[in-house]
Amino acid sequence: MSNNANNCLPLASYTLAVFPGIPVAPIEQDFPVSVRITMAAIDPARIEGDEEEPATLRILKPADNFDDEDDEDDEDEDDDDEDDEVSAEDMAQIKKLIAANEDGLDEVEGGDDDEDDDEDDEMEFEEDDEDDDDEGEIEDFVVCTLSPKFGYQQTLDLVITPGEQIMFEVTGSYAIHLSGNYIEHPYDMEDEDELLALGEDDEDDEDELDEGEYDLSPDEDEVINGDERLVELMEQDDEDDEDDEDEEEEPVVEPKKILKRAAEEKKQEKAAKKAKVAFTKNLEQGPTPSEPKPKLVTRQLEGGVKIEDRTVGEGPSAKVGSKVGVRYVGKLANGKVFDSNSKGKPFYFSVGKGEVIRGWDIGVQGMKVKGERRIIIPPGMAYGKQKLPGIPPNSQLTFDVKVVNIK
């Protein structure tokens, strides 16, 4: 049993029922896992006998024969010492055997062999009897005593490994139930650790063999290192030669060329200074102003109609009798849009035929295709005092017109 319970890792619950008069092993051979027993509890149901005897849990284990083995070892050593000492009688017997003929020697040897065999047989029987006596010795140890009258259970802390030869037995009138845990004990891991260590040693040996390195003597190391140092010195010498050649190959500049180059550099510096000054002046003036947009020219036509050309356009100009297609947006003086044609079919009318208000007939004349114009029409050239949906009476109207077609 082990006391190293703090280093044990619980794996699963463990239970065992021990009935009176029936020894039971704590660990099954089919499941060799260490266990830690932490509780012993009595079953109040009486099993044996009419009297209510308390139940005592015992551990049974073979007796330790360390003293007997030591005694046997001492006896064996004494026997060996006696055998090493040759008596005078034995020496005389040996001389007689040497002097005898071969036949007599064979008979004497045969007789001695028979006697030795008989003695060996007697020794074996005696040893067997001693072994039988030792094997029959069983020691028992009391773990706890429980009774329904004075104690139902007892806390324990027993760790049992698969290698231990022990059994539990109960004496009394009641069964005792043990509980605890199956555990991962360090003892169980020793074999695995040894195998892993052996495997690592083998891998290390293989790595050393694979590297193909040999242990060289100091003289051989000096020779190899000396060769490497020689190669390094030769390479360094080659590099120095190359540097010398590079220095020799640099062209010699004539004094005239140097002066000429210096003069050119001075000119470039002066030009750079001028550029810097000019650039600085521009910066002081602020960002480059955008090109001023041309002012729109407003022209006043018949009846007070005013026009402003935004885009001149191209092609022939519209005149009286021309049929033009236009896009337009009509606004009041306050900027409110009351009519427009910006998509779909353009609006077509004949110029000067009275198909539109008078301000349109006058304001569209002279426009070209893709031309854009703003036409400002006073009330007298529009709808006058007439009130229309979205157009109050006496309203000044402004139209932005674009010609898309002239026929």
From Swiss-Prot:
The keyword Transmembrane helix does not apply. Keywords: Isomerase, Nucleus, Rotamase. Residues 65-88, 103-136, 236-252 have a biased composition (Acidic residues). GO terms for cellular component: chromatin; nucleolus. Residues 46-136, 191-223, 236-297 are annotated as: Disordered. It catalyses: [protein]-peptidylproline (omega=180) = [protein]-peptidylproline (omega=0). Residues 321-407 form the PPIase FKBP-type domain. Gene3D superfamilies: 3.10.50.40, Nucleoplasmin core domain. Inhibited by both FK506 and rapamycin. Residues 253-272 have a biased composition (Basic and acidic residues). It comes from the Eukaryota. It is found in: Nucleus, Nucleolus. InterPro entries: EF_Hand_1_Ca_BS, NPL, PPIase_dom_sf, PPIase_FKBP_dom, PPIase_Fpr3/Fpr4-like. Its EC number is 5.2.1.8. Its main location: nucleus. GO terms for molecular function: peptidyl-prolyl cis-trans isomerase activity. PPIases accelerate the folding of proteins. It catalyzes the cis-trans isomerization of proline imidic peptide bonds in oligopeptides. Belongs to the FKBP-type PPIase family. FKBP3/4 subfamily. This is FK506-binding protein 3. It comes from Yarrowia lipolytica (strain CLIB 122 / E 150). The gene is FPR3.
